Amino acid sequence: MTASILGQFFPETLFFIPMNVFSMAFCLSWLVFIYPVNWAPSRFQSIWLGFRSNILEMIFQNTSPNTAPWAGLIAGVFVLILLVNVLGLFPPYAFQSPTSNISLTYSLGFPLWMAINILGFYLAFNSRLSHLVPQGTPSALIPLMVWIETLSLFAQPIALGLRLAANLTAGHLLIFLLSTAIWLLSSSLMISVPILIIFILLFVLEIGVACIQAYVFTALIHFYLQQNI
């Protein structure tokens, strides 16, 4: 049994390779097959193209023509995070859910945020600087507002990665605690059966949370993109 309640977040190894690597490689391999290159799209690729053109537009209803070329990237990030989130829920946590690790969520969110902001400053430098001073700000408060807006700007990637990792970590801890309770109380049906029912309901809820967190992450990326383009 795991010695520590946080032990589940330390990746297991297979042939000296962390299971996180296998999890990400498995999920990334799906992205290779959903983009047709020079050959006719397969049935699965056709389904993916339909998802990207219809479902993505329904999720991001305010997509502007300027951000439309980024739909493929946003959809790819959504599918990647969704697959990793869902795989990390299945016991015995063989895939060790990389998205519950802050280092990976920051590694995924920070480059996207940085690229979007660099593009925004490149395309409209003066417009981006004007966002540091809200309209109608008194002259005496302009230096303070510049500092506040700058700090809020650099807090975006921190919140982006922390929100995803914190929500998934909380869900994994609850599942771990309930599964441990079921194991320890398995000799008493009067206690273990209600806990098992709660565990199943929580597991279904966590699948929904995994989907919602993938949506929230990509929705924020889309929001930052709209602010800069």
From Swiss-Prot:
One of the record's GO cellular component terms: proton-transporting ATP synthase complex
One Pfam family of this chain: ATP-synt_A
Membrane topology value: Multi-pass membrane protein
UniProt keywords, alphabetically: ATP synthesis, CF(0), Hydrogen ion transport, Ion transport, Membrane, Mitochondrion, Mitochondrion inner membrane, Transmembrane, Transmembrane helix, Transport
Transmembrane segments: 14-34, 70-90, 105-125, 140-160, 164-184, 189-209
A GO biological-process term: proton motive force-driven ATP synthesis
Subunit structure and binding partners: F-type ATPases have 2 components, CF(1) - the catalytic core - and CF(0) - the membrane proton channel. CF(1) has five subunits: alpha(3), beta(3), gamma(1), delta(1), epsilon(1). CF(0) has three main subunits: a, b and c.
Role of this protein: Mitochondrial membrane ATP synthase (F(1)F(0) ATP synthase or Complex V) produces ATP from ADP in the presence of a proton gradient across the membrane which is generated by electron transport complexes of the respiratory chain. F-type ATPases consist of two structural domains, F(1) - containing the extramembraneous catalytic core and F(0) - containing the membrane proton channel, linked together by a central stalk and a peripheral stalk. During catalysis, ATP synthesis in the catalytic domain of F(1) is coupled via a rotary mechanism of the central stalk subunits to proton translocation.
Name of the protein in its database record: ATP synthase subunit a
Underlying gene: ATP6
